[in-house]
């Protein structure tokens, strides 16, 4: 396990909308380089960079046509190497986005695979053995695409043909389903290793793996896919022990034993995560909602078994959002609401991820036309709001030439305005990041224990502990004040306020009463008894 993950706080950068350095309306790598100072100011120490490879951009770069070259709209391989080098000098590590399971239909490998004549790439993708065979359990196919007599299996959109990592349980009725140890699946695995090695040698610190559980087909329990990643992890541990990999699998109990250092909790596959910030209001409220109708047990009853089963093997990552999650965290929330959400995100175990702009409370824009396969996700991908200059400081291009429009309301949050405000959300998030990194009890692998977490009640109180240091975190997202008795956890001396609400503890008999105003919380160091 790379030691640096213990103190890691990640920041997700969507390159096309972060900062445009050349005025063409699209963000780029030199633009990110110019903004490294901001990341250092914020206090994050790691970056997840969304796909930046050559692509026709039908799915915003998740349709790769060359895994070894940076897309010209973002810059060059030399630009990316410069970014790696300069970031590392500033204490920042960069993880690339690895689309391991499929390519674009524009990839030269796939174009060769489409040919009716047998060649080196014929079996690098999954094809049925007749154009008239278009269905098989567990896969979807695109029919009649090529002169080759067969239909190809796709992972998501029709232009994302699945690479052939084999089938865990090939169906004898479908001889085109190759076992995982067949020559072509083994060749594809070797190519994946080559891609990983290429970018690690250039300076990447690891990878976020897109659709990590999708590689081996007809693998219902994920065992063969897990075996593949375990082999990669063993190789990384030997040759690149400081490299980290995180999976988009949303199944920590599968992904972490499979070799990933981290696995995301995500709305799809994790109702508990959804209950924190984005539970549909027509059924019930999220926990972080001032109405006070949320329930922390909806999260904890799912999270705790996952945490207990994986805590000695890897980390669960709880993100503030990402490019696929709508709406943004800032939608419908005040700065106080958001501060409390970040108090939670930055004091929980595992590795936190901040989606660009969430630290200033950026909002999704409704009603945007889909861009590069974004569809309903497009509004959560708009340009970073740097200042009050045209285009929010994102680009000098004419507004109608921007990759996506910026929010133009007078009250839009910006980095410049919040840097100038000592009590701004941005500076609160900075304080919380610094708090996390200054206290071993708040590191990724330090112990976690709920102290008060009753269904439908407030506050939510938990302990983090490492060695002699114990920190109590209390959260009241409801607009009404709350009070709870805390017995047995404290000494006779009141806890030290590290962050947030002061004067929260009152001595009551042999115990303590914890009182929190509405929409408030704090982190408190406990003294030894």
Roles of regions detected by a PLM:
Residues 2-190, 201, 212-259, 384, ...:
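Acidic/aromatic-lined carbohydrate-recognition and catalytic surfaces
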Residues 496-512:
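Solvent-exposed beta-strand/loop surfaces of large extracellular or lumenal domains
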Residues 481-501:
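Beta-strand-rich binding/interaction modules
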Residues 105-139, 229, 233-383, 388:
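Conserved alpha/beta catalytic core and glycan-binding cleft of carbohydrate-active enzymes
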Residues 196-218, 318-322:
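Active-site groove signature of glycoside hydrolases
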Residues 508-529:
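C-terminal beta-strand-rich structural cap/linker in extracellular carbohydrate-active enzymes
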Residues 5-6, 239, 259, 298, ...:
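Loop/helix patches that line or flank the sugar-binding groove of alpha-linked glycan CAZymes
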Residues 16-18, 53-55, 100-101, 205, ...:
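Short, solvent-exposed loop/turn segments at secondary-structure junctions
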């Amino acid at each position: 396990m790379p030691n640096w993950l213990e103190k890691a706080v990640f920041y997700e950068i969507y390159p096309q909308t972060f900062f445009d350095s050349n005025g063409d309306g699209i963000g780029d790598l030199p633009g990110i380089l110019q903004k490294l100072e901001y990341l250092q100011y914020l206090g994050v120490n790691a970056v997840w960079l969304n796909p930046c490879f050559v692509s026709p951009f039908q799915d915003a770069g998740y349709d790769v046509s060359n895994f070894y070259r940076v897309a010209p709209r973002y810059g060059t391989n030399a630009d990316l190497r410069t970014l790696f080098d300069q970031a590392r000098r500033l204490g920042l590590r960069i993880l690339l986005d690895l689309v391991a399971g499929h390519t674009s239909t524009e990839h030269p490998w796939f174009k060769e695979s489409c040919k009716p004549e047998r060649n080196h790439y014929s079996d690098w993708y999954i094809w049925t053995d007749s154009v008239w065979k278009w269905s098989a359990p567990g896969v979807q196919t695109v029919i009649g695409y090529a002169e080759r007599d067969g239909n190809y299996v796709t992972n998501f959109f029709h232009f994302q043909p699945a690479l052939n990592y084999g089938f865990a349980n090939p169906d004898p009725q479908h001889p085109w389903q190759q076992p995982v140890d067949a020559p072509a699946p083994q060749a594809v695995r070797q190519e994946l290793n080559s891609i990983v090695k290429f970018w690690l040698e250039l300076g990447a610190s690891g990878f976020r793996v897109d659709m990590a559980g999708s590689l081996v087909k007809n693998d219902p329990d994920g065992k063969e896919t897990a075996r593949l990643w375990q082999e990669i992890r063993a190789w990384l541990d030997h040759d690149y022990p400081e490299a980290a990999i995180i999976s988009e699998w949303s199944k920590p109990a599968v992904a972490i034993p499979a070799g990933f250092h981290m696995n995301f909790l995500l709305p799809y596959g994790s109702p508990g995560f959804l209950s924190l910030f984005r539970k549909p209001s027509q059924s019930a409220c999220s926990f972080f909602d001032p109405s006070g109708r949320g329930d922390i047990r909806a999260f904890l009853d799912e999270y705790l078994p996952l945490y207990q089963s994986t805590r000695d093997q890897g980390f669960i990552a709880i993100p503030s959002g990402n490019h696929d999650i709508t709406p943004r965290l800032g939608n419908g929330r005040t700065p106080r609401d958001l501060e409390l959400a970040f108090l939670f995100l930055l004091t929980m175990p595992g590795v936190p991820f901040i989606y660009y702009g969430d630290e200033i409370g950026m909002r999704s824009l409704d009603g945007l036309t889909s861009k590069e396969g974004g569809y309903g996700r497009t509004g959560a991908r708009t340009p970073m709001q740097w200042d009050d200059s045209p285009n929010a400081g994102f680009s000098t291009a004419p507004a109608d030439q921007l990759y996506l429009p910026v929010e133009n309301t007078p009250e839009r949050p910006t980095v410049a305005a919040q840097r100038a405000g000592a009590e701004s959300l941005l500076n609160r998030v900075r304080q919380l990041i610094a708090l996390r990194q200054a206290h071993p009890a708040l590191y990724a692998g330090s112990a976690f224990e709920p102290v008060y977490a009753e269904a439908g009640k407030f506050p939510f109180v938990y302990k983090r502990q490492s060695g002699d240091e114990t920190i109590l975190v209390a959260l009241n997202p409801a607009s009404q004040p709350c009070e709870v008795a805390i017995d047995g956890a404290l000494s006779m001396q009141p806890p030290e306020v590290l962050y947030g609400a002061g004067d929260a503890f009152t001595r009551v008999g042999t115990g303590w009463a914890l009182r929190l105003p509405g929409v408030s919380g704090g982190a408190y160091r406990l003294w030894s008894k």
